[in-house]
């Protein structure tokens, strides 16, 4: 199915899309966190960020004169054997006169601080925007209308037009910027450094543990209902539900890795964000009915457009390159997982031939062999490790919580 509607070519500039959703409150908060999500360096020891534009995140609630502040470096670590391990730095934005460097004037030199301002901003003024209380307000997604950071940095894509339930507080009850629930913000903060592809699989596992476990009968029903209504249950391969992958015709999406892992492949969850809903498919498609000997065939042609300035544009392109006509291939960065702990049970009579009647010498296990067995991971340990992968690996695709849409799961 191809995926809004196609339009003719034009030389006119691309339209500016005005995004809705939660906005930073107009009145300052008593918290101490940045209003915005972090910029994340792609490599260790990356230089401070440089910006194509002003470097000030979009916030339409502030006057132009107030559009100035600083980016502050935050060292990050992940746990590991023998202690913590450094991962690439994060940079957080604060308005002048707020945050950890509230005592500095705009432009004062200090290590780990990068000052930015919009054209026409009054950098001698100090902001009354305050900082964020994480218990009341969620992070606001970064948007740069005049150009973002250089290629050494990235940020997780969080859409701001996805409806979520709000948390009623005195500070936000009268504002249109009511924040998502505390549980939602806690989940984003605690997993902000995890690889999103791994987190996609973890969310499915967590949902099953919390009472939404799919029974064998339910999974079988999901996989064998009417073809156009099927969904892939956990533990099923793609071809078990939708048939073998092909090239150049229907059923051409998915490489061998995706076929084997099914819904556990985080790329599936990410791409579901681009798939039209049933209503969008029906009312936003070009519908072509055709009578055939076996019945009525309905063809739906729908086009989903991912803007080139979307922070995840390159990632979506990469997945399409891997998975469209991807049968017989695997991602280049798909490394084999560690083997599970070998089963040390002795063979039973039913599983092995009777031994010869001779005395066998006992093999003495070396200490090195014992150590290797101890270091082998159980399947549970492998799964936990996969959930703890951080975004400092150069080939890891990071999606942001937006890739894990509630409706798609």
From Swiss-Prot:
GO terms assigned for molecular function: RNA binding
Residue(s) carrying Phosphoserine: 190, 379
Record region (RNA-binding): 29-160
Main location: virion
Top-level taxonomic group: Viruses
Keywords assigned by UniProt, alphabetized: ADP-ribosylation, Disulfide bond, Host Golgi apparatus, Phosphoprotein, Ribonucleoprotein, RNA-binding, Transcription, Transcription regulation, Viral nucleoprotein, Virion
UniProt feature, compositional bias: Polar residues: 341-355
Pfam families per UniProt: CoV_nucleocap (PF00937)
Residues covered by region (Disordered): 1-32, 44-63, 120-145, 164-193, 326-409
Name used for this protein in its record: Nucleoprotein
Organism encoding this protein: Avian infectious bronchitis virus (strain H120) (IBV)
Lineage: Viruses, Riboviria, Orthornavirae, Pisuviricota, Pisoniviricetes
